């Protein structure tokens, strides 16, 4: 049976499989070092929509459609969607997945939403509550700036060192059906606040929590990082 492991982890007796995945991103992301690994690059940041929020919804639906296409699955075969975004009331997710008519668990974890959706989706499949589940997340530079910092129309100047929110979406299909990769366990992180107040340095805000979770994962599963 599934078991609690260490202080913050779970080990799956029946690990769920990563059956398919897909990624969609904007032009800037496509020009970066990971560009060739992205499935679909959208040159138009608006994706043909009238506002940033609708553009982010379009990112989600495109990523989901690609993942389903890779898996050879139809929306009717998916039991649940675990999905989230960076916006209030998860509006990008709500409007993005509406047409699929799949039961939705809306999740908000900011930059940890991807890990959060995968964790809960994996628990659901491993426990036998579903056989096919989607885990989805998205963000958009324009919509995030509008909600959290300065709307692009304001014309605020950013330092060259400023962190940029990704314009993109990722979708994962977890399944009880065997595939090339599986999730053997999860470690859930805690809120760790070192008092960083610079909204243009998101990495510094998140790094302490990330480091704490990685360290706890290694201890809970009795693993050690690879040496030089």
Please report, for each region that a protein language model flagged, where it lies by residue.
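Short, well-ordered, mixed-charge alpha-helical segments that flank or form enzyme active sites
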Residues: 90-91, 141-146, 191-195
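Solvent-exposed alpha-helices and their adjacent loops that cap or buttress functional pockets
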Residues: 7-12, 73-74, 96-99, 113, ...
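A glycine- and small-aliphatic-rich helix-loop capping segment at beta-alpha/alpha-beta transitions
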Residues: 34-37, 93-103, 125-127, 148-157, ...
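Short beta-strand segments
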Residues: 19, 83-84, 133-139
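Conserved beta-ketoacyl condensing-enzyme motif
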Residues: 18, 53-109, 227-228
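Short, well-ordered amphipathic alpha-helical segments that serve as non-catalytic structural scaffolds
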Residues: 56-72, 118-120, 205-221
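Active-site-proximal alpha-helical scaffold in enzymes
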Residues: 107-135, 174, 208
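Condensing-enzyme catalytic core mediating Claisen C-C bond formation in acyl metabolism
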Residues: 1-53, 151-216, 220-224
